[in-house]
């Protein structure tokens, strides 16, 4: 397989599993002879790739499976290799056909960010070549919108003027406007009857005010409860004074008061005499 190496290229050989020393030694010798520098060829186990601390964008080519073609690269491994390659760097894969899903591998390569993916095969091996894009992953580029000259400047100017037109400029004579004074009638300004605003809290069952009641039912129930506690006279003369009160009158001992005046009695006064 032609790896497309040149003099000065920095190469990473990736292996996994059981490696034959003579095969690895021969491959390293061939690559060193091509790049003309022994230090430019490095060998790495794929299992230790994340711990190797290689600099990003530091390799011109990565050879995967050239020594151990039975290896199967994971998606994480492909992403890590992409970060190690320089822009336009090459990734070459040589893998055995046994239990190899070529379509899935090509899909994972494209999904990881590789471009120019091409596949070939020999008797026992599948050979795949791909490249890193000619830019760094995550880099940004300014689009030349500001320098572009519009071919239809007059049309653009007319479009921009539309936003500055007033309502009278765009209205047709046949279009009838709604009179804003007719949107709200006199009935809308009338204050509603409070009785119509009360909610049917509880329906026909025992009325119970809701929590944080706003319809007035809570105040009404409080008044009813206070009226039940307030003692009522059976003779109607309690307000005149003790001379007109019965012996069991709860107001006994209190000064005379006006009819309808609210009198607060203590619990001792409400208790029956023993």
Swiss-Prot record:
Region spans: Fe-S binding site A: 201-215
Region span, N-terminal SAM-like domain: 5-145
GO biological process: iron-sulfur cluster assembly
Motif (Cx2C motif 1): 235-238
Name of a matching Pfam family: CIAPIN1
Localization per record: Cytoplasm; Mitochondrion intermembrane space
Keywords: 2Fe-2S, 4Fe-4S, Cytoplasm, Iron, Iron-sulfur, Metal-binding, Mitochondrion
Region (Fe-S binding site B): 235-249
Domain of life: Eukaryota
Binding residue positions for [2Fe-2S] cluster: 201, 210, 213, 215
Residue ranges annotated as motif Cx2C motif 2: 246-249
Span list, region Linker: 145-189
Any one cellular-component term (Gene Ontology): mitochondrial intermembrane space
Residue positions binding [4Fe-4S] cluster: 235, 238, 246, 249
Co-factor requirement: [2Fe-2S] cluster; [4Fe-4S] cluster
An example Gene Ontology molecular-function term: metal ion binding
Alphabetized HAMAP family for the sequence: Anamorsin
Assembly mode: Monomer.
Domain notes: The C-terminal domain binds 2 Fe-S clusters but is otherwise mostly in an intrinsically disordered conformation.
Function text: Component of the cytosolic iron-sulfur (Fe-S) protein assembly (CIA) machinery. Required for the maturation of extramitochondrial Fe-S proteins. Part of an electron transfer chain functioning in an early step of cytosolic Fe-S biogenesis, facilitating the de novo assembly of a [4Fe-4S] cluster on the cytosolic Fe-S scaffold complex. Electrons are transferred from NADPH via a FAD- and FMN-containing diflavin oxidoreductase.
Family membership: Belongs to the anamorsin family.
Protein name: Anamorsin homolog
Organism of provenance: Ixodes scapularis
